Amino acid sequence: MTDNSKICVVVGMSGGVDSSVTALLLKEQGYDVIGVFMKNWHDTDEFGVCTATEDYKDVAAVADQIGIPYYSVNFEKEYWDRVFEYFLAEYRAGRTPNPDVMCNKEIKFKAFLDYAMTLGADYVATGHYAQVKRDENGTVHMLRGADNGKDQTYFLSQLSQEQLQKTLFPLGHLQKSEVREIAERAGLATAKKKDSTGICFIGEKNFKQFLSQYLPAQKGRMMTIDGRDMGEHAGLMYYTIGQRGGLGIGGQHGGDNQPWFVVGKDLSQNILYVGQGFYHEALMSNSLDASVIHFTREMPEEFTFECTAKFRYRQPDSHVRVHVRGDKAEVVFAEPQRAITPGQAVVFYDGKECLGGGMIDMAYKNGQPCQYI
């Protein structure tokens, strides 16, 4: 049996059941485990529910239960500078960002990893549903989590080989239901705690109210593609391509009586375009351009390959052909795709392995850019 007692693993503990079980499993496997709670957002907020103080109490309770030391570290400045400023800039540019991807890249696996090294860590571990596998050459491959419904490789797609070399994902081979069972059997304080939702680290808030604190909303016209005025929108940043709810025009129907969706934006004119039908022609595209292209292991500077891809979390994989030039890529779809959204991540897969990905800049239909920003 391997002696893990001299291997120090620092676990990012959020106060949730997943990171609690992560720490428990590593402790049971004999590792020298240290828990760390990351505080990345200020507590005093007039909207929604801020749970940082209660979450830290849960971390303390679980750490005491399983017998590990624990610390709290403040990354508020790093989060603001590296994630939140990016988040706001993307919304200003009419895009729909995915802060979780950037949060993992810059905070959980950079700022936290650096801090863990100062504690003497050999590895860091988190409660993500993903797997790492080292090949005979020592290269680490990131694989999907065994629980298809919980797999989080989409959000981890910007991690580097250097980061993956130092990372453990103890829950990767488990189903979520098994994680709950382990927590309940061990009597962990977080066993019945509900999963968190909302923006990475910021928690559950009224998104419209939250965003309006930082970006002034500019109301404008809501129109159909053919120029019919449909009323007023509350501010382009509040809408995403393919969105159905929140338009306030449910009672206005054309001849086909189908629901209305956001089908485009014109940032320069402050116009929100809407159309009827889930598969409205303006929502369909057959290629995209992406930037910030990144692979989890070494790849050539320029190459073309075929794989599957996701354009949003929990979406079924789609077959694509990818041509990479440096940190940019053209991605051509085997079948037309709906609501490809600038600012979201496109993530590439080879079977179970997550190869990496990038950020969507523009969608195209037959070579013509879709009016999505």
Swiss-Prot record:
One of its GO terms (cellular component) is cytoplasm. ATP binds at residues 12-19, 38, 127. It catalyses: S-sulfanyl-L-cysteinyl-[protein] + uridine(34) in tRNA + AH2 + ATP = 2-thiouridine(34) in tRNA + L-cysteinyl-[protein] + A + AMP + diphosphate + H(+). InterPro entries: MnmA-like, MnmA-like_C, MnmA-like_central, MnmA-like_central_sf, Rossmann-like_a/b/a_fold. The active site is at residues 103, 200. Belongs to the MnmA/TRMU family. It is found in: Cytoplasm. Its EC number is 2.8.1.13. This is tRNA-specific 2-thiouridylase MnmA. Residues 150-152, 312-313 are annotated as: Interaction with tRNA. The gene is mnmA. Pfam families: tRNA_Me_trans (PF03054), tRNA_Me_trans_C (PF20258), tRNA_Me_trans_M (PF20259). One of its GO terms (molecular function) is ATP binding. Catalyzes the 2-thiolation of uridine at the wobble position (U34) of tRNA, leading to the formation of s(2)U34. Coiled coil: none annotated. Residues 98-100 are annotated as: Interaction with target base in tRNA. PANTHER family: MITOCHONDRIAL TRNA-SPECIFIC 2-THIOURIDYLASE 1 (PTHR11933:SF5), TRNA 5-METHYLAMINOMETHYL-2-THIOURIDYLATE -METHYLTRANSFERASE (PTHR11933). The record marks 128, 344 as: Interaction with tRNA. Disulfide bonds join 103-200. Keywords: ATP-binding, Cytoplasm, Disulfide bond, Nucleotide-binding, RNA-binding, Transferase, tRNA processing, tRNA-binding. GO terms for biological process: tRNA wobble position uridine thiolation.
